[in-house]
Regions:
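Extreme N-terminal basic, low-complexity initiation segments
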Residues: 2-10
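Active-site helical microenvironments for divalent-metal-assisted chemistry
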Residues: 11-12, 18-285
Length: 285
């Protein structure tokens, strides 16, 4: 579904955006900078939400760089669609949103928006370095290299070797964070894929990406990747468990509160300072 375009228009478009963005103090910042995008306000592919998140922790200059990356990516991916029919640029914006929610830096967010341009368009790594600097180009290159290695075995020993190989290839932790966010959004939109491909990607997610997220201590990614992998690999089991858990949700919460209170009383009786935190297990666990 993807079509390549010559790199010339991409780099020319990005170069034309090197001047600072105009800012109307009578409008909110997100509305001001989004109003200048092609096709605005008809569609922003998630950029309004992204900009609003970025405003909470990045400078205007950093957000302007990310907006330039969006226009560079939109030009590079022009005419490309995902299996769902959505414009392709909506995917890297969603990946960037995941990282913005974690308050990653401007370079990582920029790389997230550009992460598929080298592999899937005729924009080059040199174009990215020229427009956004060597740091962003290095992150995009790192993600592209991870995309080139293929997982082919379900054997646990080989899966572990594959995880070690991926982690060994990474010189910057932000590379794997972009890749994990990329995988998460792909899993969230996996329904548009053929059944066989869904199963393969779900297995790969459970064997490779969820364990890496766990190893890095990114519990949110781990939980979401595991549940989504489970949903697509074992859909019947997932539906049965999901239905059962929804029925018993109230009882589970009461049980967690009760057990937490019992532990807290025991600690107090023994004069032990501590904090007890209870949580409900997610579906895959």
């Amino acid at each position: 579904d993807r079509r390549l375009i010559p790199p010339g228009p991409v780099t020319a478009r990005a170069a034309s955006l090197s001047t600072p963005l105009g800012y109307d103090r009578g409008m909110d910042y997100a509305a001001t900078i989004l109003a200048r995008l092609p096709g605005a306000p008809r569609r922003d592919h998630g950029m309004r939400q992204l900009v609003e998140t970025l405003e909470t922790y990045l400078t205007r200059e950093q957000i302007e760089m990310i907006m330039r990356a969006y226009e560079f990516g939109a030009a590079a991916h022009k005419g490309q669609t995902r299996k769902s029919g959505e414009p392709y640029i909506s995917h890297p914006v969603a990946v960037a949103q995941e990282l913005a929610d974690m308050h990653l830096d401007a370079q990582a967010i920029t790389a997230a928006i550009l992460h598929d341009t080298v592999e899937d368009t005729e924009a080059s790594l040199e174009d990215i370095e020229e427009q956004f600097g060597p740091e962003v180009a290095g992150l995009v290159d790192g993600v592209s290299k991870l995309d080139q290695i293929q997982f082919r075995s379900r054997a646990e020993a080989q899966a572990e070797s594959f995880r070690k190989m991926m982690l060994a290839m990474i010189e910057d932790i932000r590379v794997i964070l972009v890749k994990l966010a990329d995988r998460l959004h792909n899993m969230q939109t996996l329904g548009a894929m053929p059944a066989e491909k869904r199963s393969r990607i779900a297995r790969e997610t459970l064997d490779i990406y969820a364990p890496i997220a766990n190893r890095l201590g990114i519990n949110r990614f781990k939980v979401l990747l595991e549940d989504l992998g489970f949903k697509h690999l074992y859909p019947m089991r997932y539906r049965v468990l999901d239905k059962a858990l929804k029925r018993s949700k109230g009882n589970q919460r009461q049980m967690v509160k009760k057990i937490t209170a019992e532990f807290e009383r025991t600690l107090e009786e023994e004069n032990i300072e501590g904090q007890v935190i209870g949580r409900e297990k997610h579906l895959y666990s």
